[in-house]
Each structure stands twice: as C-alpha cells, then as structure tokens.
C-alpha cells in the first residue's frame, strides 16, 4: 500500500508538471481564474468560520481529487505525518553508484512527540546513553500536574517514562522543551509513578547537565537511508537486532562486519558498551533498508569505561572518518 501510494504521488506530481509545461494558462484564463477565486474567497471564508475549520477546495479530475482526499486524511493522523516526513526528504548523491540514497534531514521523533525547543546552550547535544540531570514536569492533557522532579539518569533507562528519554535527546544544557507523550510511550522501568497507558501526557523538561562530554555533532555526521517506509521509528531504550559494518574511508579496510561472522548484534539502544554512534544512528531509524553513516572515528568509542563490544578503542584510527552501515533490522520485544 505504501509503495502504491508513493507511486501515485510521484505520478501526480510529474503529470501536473508536464501539464503546466505543455498547456500554460493564457492571460485571459489567468484573469478569469483570479476573478473566480476572488469572488469565491469571501464565500469560503464565511463557510470556514461556520465550520470552524478552513475550507479546502479540491481541483482536477475525479482521480486527482480522490488521491488528494487520501493524502489530506492521512496527514490528520500522527502516523500519516511521520510517513510523509519520511517521503518528503530530498535525494542526495549516492554513496553506492549502483543505488540511490536519501539524506536524512528530518527528525521523525520530533514529529512523533510534537517537540518544541526553547532557549539555547553550548554543551551537548545529549545522545541516547548519556547520563543527564533534568528537571521535568508531567501533566495530563488538561494541564493538571501529575509529577515533577529533578532526576539524574541514563538516557534509555526510562526511569520515568520512555517518551521522556526520547524528548531529551538532542537537547543542549540550558535548553527547555515541551512535548506530548503518546500513551504507548508512557511505560517505564521504575516502581515509582505508573502512568495510565490509555492517555497522552504533556511534558516540560529542562536539561541541567550531560556526562560524559563526548558528543556527536550533527554538522560532522552524514546519515543516508536507501529505503523509506510507513512505520514508526526506533526509539532510545528499545531493543533491536541488526547487522553492522565499519569501513575505514581512507583505504577501504573493513574494521568490523557482523554479517561475515553470522552473528547479528542484539542491542538496547543506549547501551554504553557499544559505540556511541550506534545509538545515535539507530534512534529514529525506520526498520527497513540500510542506514549509512559517515562520522568521526572518536564517535565509534563506547561511552562506558574501556569496554567496547564492537571494536577495541586501540584499534580505532585517530582523526579519521569512518563509514558505518546498519541493516537487517528486527525489533526485540
């Protein structure tokens, strides 16, 4: 269904471009359309005020109007918005000349949790696996305060609710965020306040500190996907099985390849015994295709002590960029 809908959208876009190129409107038609639009605008505005929502006029033949209605209705749902965030990302030059890739610009997690960020900071950003200290407030959708506290915890451990961990990711120290946590992400690993998983919740959070101060800077990382899909992305704190391959860009030497050993990685996103870049790349990934990541070698270090389950720290080249390829995703319950 997703592929069919994507095909329809592409065909419609191409059809309208060709139609505009071959049959340009003349001035008289343009004037007539402007007059009709002007005459109808007041009527539409009045109707919109009655219905309490803007009137959407659908033009074109029956097929075009039907597809437009499908798209409009899809965009009214959270999963529909996430799907179109996935589709509407610009194509970039391919890493593999025999294939194409899509450069990841949008953060689907921000869309999922309706995140708004306020203030600024110069320490960060927080990634899944970092130890953070935050002040948070959780309210119901009627703004009745349910819980507030200052707490220190590891992102991915979900001591309060899984959604809160994911709202904090990407924050700088000193910033604050407001978000809405969907009911399915209110689960936690604590014996404290248990939230009803039948309701959504409002969250306000202020980031006070991050440890250790080993960060993945978005302007020094390139992430590409070779496939998109109508699915909810992976989140910090969830468990996933996948294959990983690490290649040295300077000479093409393969430093690690789980597929060649026949042993895929089973990992909780945020596990500090795996390279930091793994959690960074997995959080927000839709479980299809291959995600290719170009990042500095220092981001391939684990946040934990000197333990790195993938590649020993002493084997990592210094001041180089490495290519990480992740695929064969399977979420673990």
UniProtKB/Swiss-Prot annotation:
It is an enzyme of class 5 (isomerase). Residues 129-227 form the PPIase FKBP-type domain. SUPFAM superfamilies: FKBP-like (SSF54534). Its EC number is 5.2.1.8. Keywords: Isomerase, Rotamase. GO terms for molecular function: peptidyl-prolyl cis-trans isomerase activity. Gene3D superfamilies: 3.10.50.40. One of its GO terms (biological process) is protein folding. It catalyses: [protein]-peptidylproline (omega=180) = [protein]-peptidylproline (omega=0). This is Putative peptidyl-prolyl cis-trans isomerase RT0383. It comes from Rickettsia typhi (strain ATCC VR-144 / Wilmington). The lineage of its organism: Bacteria, Pseudomonadati, Pseudomonadota, Alphaproteobacteria, Rickettsiales.
